[in-house]
Swiss-Prot record:
Pfam families: GHMP_kinases_C, GHMP_kinases_N. Pathway: Isoprenoid biosynthesis; isopentenyl diphosphate biosynthesis via DXP pathway; isopentenyl diphosphate from 1-deoxy-D-xylulose 5-phosphate: step 3/6. Its EC number is 2.7.1.148. This is 4-diphosphocytidyl-2-C-methyl-D-erythritol kinase, chloroplastic/chromoplastic. Its cofactor is Mg(2+).
């Protein structure tokens, strides 16, 4: 996308040597998204073009210079690069599943207490952070439609929280490459927030401890503190009380995630939840059994399944069909969080009916595995992790002007 050409008056008819700079912008080489540029143009700097001004000495000639408005952002980013020790950072933002989820009581504040084994898995988003010269606003872009890009997004909330807690004044260009579906019970937004807090702390020279980041994060979301564990945790309270544990599950156990196009409203699921009809099994006994005997159908209890199946009856049918069609290939089939993702642990392959039935032509499918992270490092995407099939891509972003 080029602006109208700029004309200069030239009175010297001699050969004139002009610098022609053609800028192509993409997320791989500059900190802000610009998917609307022609991707066939190559990135060339300082290439020269010779222009002749013909005619009489006294005639005035016009010389055409190609100009791209993105040049000003290139210069700003280069200036930031020179002045800052860390100016760009790309991080993996993995999601989680609830291997079991017990709702243990209703609190006076209207929330419910839970007890759950949270575990990070290999499906995740990528978030690219770049320092912005702005001192007043973050700029967020993403590759999918329907994701809010303003203060409703947990990424922006996390940056505002970090600045409030630390007094730092860094603002960012952020691009979210989204692969985790929304409304899935996988904690994708919570992971984005935790990843953002960790990134902001890196840019500020780690002025906060991870423990502080974890405590602060509970102010903007109950599931966010979990991601500051090492990847496996027994979580209680609203989910913000995190007990880091060694992973009780071998990392080589595969799984498949199946999410229908319809999402479950978490608020509606909890509204329909009836405590007196929920499971009475001791959650610590579930954790102990998983640690000693591994995952099985009887330990993957989710008290939110009955109300979620009321909200979305087709989800119950999907779970039943996966169990029946699996014929023992899955160690357990269960819903994660408040839905609407059905998880089949034990095989990376979905049952054939998901491909054959018209009803499931729009489902999200992904294989995944359990992962953790080393101390003082963030999560790293495994090379083998993949999403089954092509997912539709869109592009939206803030105006960079």
């Amino acid at each position: 996308l080029w602006l109208p050409v700029i004309f200069f008056v030239v009175s010297n008819p001699k050969l004139i040597l002009l610098k022609r700079v053609v800028f192509f912008q993409s997320w791989s080489n500059r900190p802000h998204g610009s998917s609307y540029f022609n991707k066939n143009i190559q990135f060339r700097r300082n290439s020269f073009v010779i222009v002749k001004a013909s005619g009489s000495r006294t005639s005035k000639k016009q010389v055409e210079i190609t100009y791209n408005p993105e040049e000003k952002f290139n210069k700003l980013a280069d200036e930031v690069d020179r002045e800052a020790g860390l100016s760009r950072l790309t991080l993996f933002s993995p999601c989680k599943i609830n291997v079991f989820l017990r709702i243990t009581s209703k609190r006076d504040d209207g929330y419910h207490d839970l007890a759950s084994l949270f575990h990070v898995i290999s499906l995740g988003d990528k978030i690219k952070f770049s320092l912005s010269p702005s001192k007043s606003k973050d700029r967020l872009s993403t590759n999918v439609a329907g994701v809010p890009l303003d203060e409703r997004n947990l990424i922006i909330k996390a940056l505002n929280l970090y600045r409030k807690k630390t007094g730092t004044d860094n603002y960012f260009w952020i691009h979210l490459d989204k692969k985790v579906p929304t409304g899935a019970g996988l904690g994708g937004g919570s992971s984005n927030a935790a990843t953002t807090l960790w990134a902001a702390n890196q840019f500020s020279g780690c002025v906060a401890t991870e423990k502080e980041l974890q405590e602060w994060s509970g102010e903007i979301g109950s599931d966010i503190p979990f991601f500051f564990s090492h990847g496996a945790a027994y979580c209680t309270g609203r989910g913000e009380v995190v007990q880091d544990i060694p992973s009780p599950i071998p990392f080589d156990i595969p799984m498949v995630l199946i999410k229908p196009q319809q999402a479950c409203s978490t608020a509606e699921v909890y509204k329909r939840f009836q405590l007196d009809l929920s499971s009475k099994v001791d959650p610590l006994s579930l954790l102990e059994k998983i640690s000693t005997s591994g995952i099985s159908q009887d330990v993957c209890v989710n008290d939110l399944e009955p109300p979620a199946f009321e909200v979305l009856p087709s989800l119950k049918r999907l779970k039943q069909r996966v169990i029946a069609a699996g014929r023992g290939q899955y160690d357990a089939v269960f819903m994660s969080g408040s839905g609407s993702t059905i998880v089949g642990v034990g095989s990376p392959d979905p049952p054939q009916f998901v491909y054959d039935d018209e009803e499931y032509k729009d489902v999200f499918l992904s294989e995944a595995s359990f992962i953790t992270r080393p101390a003082n490092e963030w999560y790293v995407e495994p090379v083998s992790g993949s999403t089954i099939g092509d997912q539709p891509e869109f592009s939206t972003s803030f105006d960079m002007s």
